């Protein structure tokens, strides 16, 4: 290479460094997409567990069971991953259930996704 004004003008390796930074940025974006996807999946699982638990509790409540929330807790615990019933209350003929599902976000730690559902007779 020729020197311009006494300074070497060597550009070899410049694209390698730029390529390495581009790959690192792409990897970081991909990792964030995976974590966001895990959080969204946990939220959907929590909603499914809340819906099913509320339906089970409402069916027991309409049938005259003494503790319809026990059915909600039992059903939530059988989900994959197991959901925890945070609250279960009777509101007239309806049952309101809130659950949470754990989600592992790697370096961001363990978090939980929550959801609520209401179920009861129609009409």
Features from the language model and the residues they span:
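Low-complexity, S/T/G/P-rich flexible repeat/linker segments used as non-globular hinges
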Residues: 3, 105-123
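Alpha-helical assembly-interface signal, strongest on the long, hydrophobic N-terminal helix that forms
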Residues: 1-69
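Short amphipathic secondary-structure patches
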Residues: 54-103, 118
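Short, structured secondary-structure boundary patches
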Residues: 32, 96-111
């Amino acid at each position: 290479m020729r020197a311009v004004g006494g300074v070497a003008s060597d550009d070899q390796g410049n694209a390698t460094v730029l390529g390495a930074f581009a790959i690192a940025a792409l990897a970081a974006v991909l990792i964030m997409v995976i974590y966001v996807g895990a959080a969204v999946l946990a939220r959907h699982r929590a909603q499914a567990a809340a819906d099913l638990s509320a339906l089970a509790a409402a069916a027991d409540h309409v049938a005259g069971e003494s503790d319809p929330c026990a059915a909600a807790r039992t059903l939530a615990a059988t989900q994959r991953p197991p959901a925890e019933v945070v609250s279960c209350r009777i509101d007239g003929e309806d049952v309101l259930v809130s659950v949470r599902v754990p989600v592992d976000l790697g370096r961001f730690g363990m978090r939980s996704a929550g959801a609520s559902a209401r179920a009861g007779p129609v009409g």
